[in-house]
């Protein structure tokens, strides 16, 4: 592709690679005249600015010269480290002179720009080259076999490489070797090339073509291989490029014959040895691979010959060519588009002439109209293979399982010599392990699980614990695997039996030292109201109780006693006891604060009296431990857990461990843990983990630990998984609970842990820790990837089912001809990943389908089955009679029941619509969700199941199986149904069609009151309801009825059958075509299975009222403006009719979005995302818009966006494709 051009008949030279910016020097060419026949000569320097889109190059300086040039080169001699304009321009003149110029002075505008000049040569100097190893050495060639080596440090006295070759001849080209600094080659028009060794000052080899027709016009050394070079021939009889290897100089190594006429110049890229430029008399510039002879690129040039061609040293993709038409052109081999250049030429022409007639009439002309080039785009393709400088020498990529895949291109020396190198491609796959401690601890956990050595594992963790809390956690976990776990829990809480016995014994010794003795029962009853004997007995134990009983009852074993029946309290109690009235006696004792007597009498009075007495006692007693005693006696442990101060959580947990029954133990521990977790104190929140360990609640332990600990590091996750695995094993062994059920949070943590293990290369361990009985899609996909990465099924693990179904979609083809026998399709299962809901009824799952494939036929919901037969079972449907459309109520049509397969054609004269995919059923998993409840169910609740991905959705059609879903409105149908876009968003139901599907007839599923003059339909008397009809009926059916104007935003496109067959809609039976608009279909309500007549009685319906739409709020009006403008731009750029149909349908279906904006029913998140999409459209960043679209769909409610987001994606995709 052409980048720049300079109108000069001149020789050219690029600035050295170290120089920035890039300059191009031009010197007036000798023996050539421009169009002005000027004899003046000049030396100019131009700057290459690729950021400027114009073709003109900026001229930096011009120096008027008295010389015209045969050769011009720019050497890097005296180039400073900063890359400033320096070096030296070396020019070969007409009269054997070599002139050295200072380019920095030329650009600065100085007059004294000549560094040195020498006229030692005889005749014009046509060959010049700079040694790339010693930049002060310059080789030159002229007539009479003159070759000089110039030292720029001592320019006055050149040296020769050796004796002149005989016979004397002109030196047409000269070149230094690119690998060996003392090797020089020269060539002459006779076809002979001589290789010189400057150390020996003699030629070492001569290369010549045996045909003697090789007129050498170009010479170039291989950039990498020191012994290879190419020679170009300008003879039209032999327009070839010969590649020679000096080790086999008897014949050319390879001959390139891509030019039709003689070659004038060649240039070998220093950046890529596989790119060789050549230009010839056939007006072609070719870029070839000299190793294979293949033409990789042909530059788009004009019909003029090019006599010089050069690569840019700094930018390897840029080259320049000087042609005989007086122009130097700059090209890029990376391709591009020339549309901009053509438009610039048109603009230049238009700006020159203006709006006046260029032929002198003086009349103004209309603006210049450029014909639209719709089919042809001037795209210039790049090279067939990537050049070396953009090919990566090395590369790396991580793959699943922690594997690192690297490649490198290694050059190895060949067997023929050390200089010859061959490129080898190596690919290495290595395992990358970054978390060694994480893997080590994971292995220890696996060994503990496999060996069942949980106690030893927990003890190691206790010994290695660095915090007291960590030590307590592992101690609690260890107790689960020991005997008497509750007693061990109490010891961990600080309640050891031995220590408690010592404390009690010490307390008893203090009591004995004070000589406090209990002498009789009255003293016991009246000793202390607060600290009752019952509480003391509870604390001192059975041994003290027995001693008390002996001390109380032994003194009263003999003698007589008085039974007093006086009027005091004792007398009343005596009378109540003598009459057996225990309840009154207890009440008297409680009244007299004789608590012990009351409780002892209540025991004699029965359990009910004892319970009431205990409650009254606890109500009167107000000691510090009364509530604890109450809970112990009444066995109300929930009261302790719910009401205790959380600072005493250890005491509450100890009480639960001591007294709670096994069936309520876990719930009480959970309750206490929940209280601790909800407390604001972080220390108490962490202690909740101990309660959950006692309860064996793994899910809550995960939640609490995640909240309390930092989980960003892999080792933090390892800490949690260790505790979870050990606790699950403990619960499984001790509590006989089902641990296979995994909660959502635990499944997420286990999945994250398995991902980390897989990333470190532990595939088997990742599979072992991954939950088995969960239906979460991400876990199912991870298990599938792990099994595939392992390469073989794991022992004890069933190979997981692929969480998606592979389908081979047949290419679209025309449907069968009408009248051909078609077997009905059998329902096929569609698999949805576990945990995901199927698409709602009628939603189109867009896929990569053939646009020519016909729409898919829906299956009647009344005939759905949850069991699918393994083989197709033909059950042809009898064709149903066509039915009319109208407004009001549900459709009167009911699907026909399947009948036995007939012996004749099941579809007489009925065309069948084929589909790109055979979806007619649904998965057993979701079949029950879509079964129709009764034949009278409304269309809004009786949609067919969703088609599989890649299938279209066709409503109705000739020969389609009956369906109770909504039907497309055929042309010419009468009625006053309001447009779908005029209805509020909340009233629109029904399936969302594909872009090329007939729109569904939206109905509100309401039962309307039947009119009084309604006539029931005639029962069905024939299995086929007028399939053909009489001629009069057909003539009436073809007459269109008076159409009722609908909203322009809800026009119904006419569908087409495959193969270009038009779809004429569903024809109406006789007598229904010319029906006035006031008539509509009645809603027939009846018992399931009631017969339906073959004629339909129409009754007058209520007149419909047109709904006036609200205006779109001002803050959202930009959305409609932006989306409609984008669709119009796409329509103007689209050339494919199918694409235009997509965009037309998208424009209509975006009305759903505008209605929701009018009603303001969209959530703020969705509206904000839509505004972001609109901003990306304004900046034409459609990729960002598609990313935002995916984010909105994945994070929002599906019911809010299903009506318009799919078509918005279609518009963005088409805009990105069309580049509007």
Swiss-Prot record:
UniProt repeat feature WD, residue ranges: 4-47, 68-111, 120-160, 166-206, 209-254, 258-298, 301-342, 397-430
PTM remark: Monoubiquitinated by the BCR(KLHL12) E3 ubiquitin ligase complex, leading to regulate the size of COPII coats.
Residues with PTM Phosphothreonine: 1161
Region (Interaction with SEC13): 161-471
Motif (ALG-2-binding site motif-2 (ABS-2),) on chain: 842-848
Organs and tissues of expression: Abundantly and ubiquitously expressed.
Chief place where the protein resides: cytoplasm
InterPro entries the record matches: Sec16_Sec23-bd, SEC31-like, WD40/YVTN_repeat-like_dom_sf, WD40_repeat_dom_sf, WD40_rpt
Listed Polar residues bias regions: 849-859, 984-995, 1031-1053
UniProt-annotated location(s): Cytoplasm; Cytoplasmic vesicle, COPII-coated vesicle membrane; Endoplasmic reticulum membrane; Cytoplasm, Cytosol
Membrane topology: Peripheral membrane protein
Region feature Disordered, mapped onto this chain: 791-908, 924-1096
Gene3D superfamilies named among the record's database cross-references: 1.25.40.1030, Functional domain of the splicing factor Prp18 (1.20.940.10), YVTN repeat-like/Quinoprotein amine dehydrogenase (2.130.10.10)
Gene Ontology process terms (BP): COPII-coated vesicle cargo loading; endoplasmic reticulum organization; endoplasmic reticulum to Golgi vesicle-mediated transport; protein transport; response to calcium ion
Start-end of Pro residues biased regions: 869-882
Crosslink (Glycyl lysine isopeptide (Lys-Gly) (interchain with G-Cter in ubiquitin)) position: 647, 1217
Record's compositionally biased regions (Low complexity): 962-972
Gene Ontology cellular component list: COPII vesicle coat; COPII-coated ER to Golgi transport vesicle; cytoplasm; cytosol; endoplasmic reticulum; endoplasmic reticulum exit site; endoplasmic reticulum membrane; ER to Golgi transport vesicle membrane
Membrane is among the record's keywords: yes
Keywords, sorted A to Z: Chromosomal rearrangement, Cytoplasm, Cytoplasmic vesicle, Endoplasmic reticulum, ER-Golgi transport, Isopeptide bond, Membrane, Phosphoprotein, Protein transport, Proto-oncogene, Repeat, Transport, Ubl conjugation, WD repeat
Subunit-structure text: COPII is composed of at least 5 proteins: the SEC23/24 complex, the SEC13/31 complex and SAR1. SEC13 and SEC31 make a 2:2 tetramer that forms the edge element of the COPII outer coat. The tetramer self-assembles in multiple copies to form the complete polyhedral cage. Interacts (via WD 8) with SEC13. Interacts with PDCD6; interaction takes place in response to cytosolic calcium increase and leads to bridge together the BCR(KLHL12) complex and SEC31A, leading to monoubiquitination. Interacts with KLHL12.
Function: Component of the coat protein complex II (COPII) which promotes the formation of transport vesicles from the endoplasmic reticulum (ER). The coat has two main functions, the physical deformation of the endoplasmic reticulum membrane into vesicles and the selection of cargo molecules.
Record-stated family: Belongs to the WD repeat SEC31 family.
Free-text domain note: The ALG-2-binding site motif-2 (ABS-2) contains a PXPGF sequence that binds hydrophobic pocket 3 of PDCD6.
Protein name: Protein transport protein Sec31A
Organism annotation: Homo sapiens
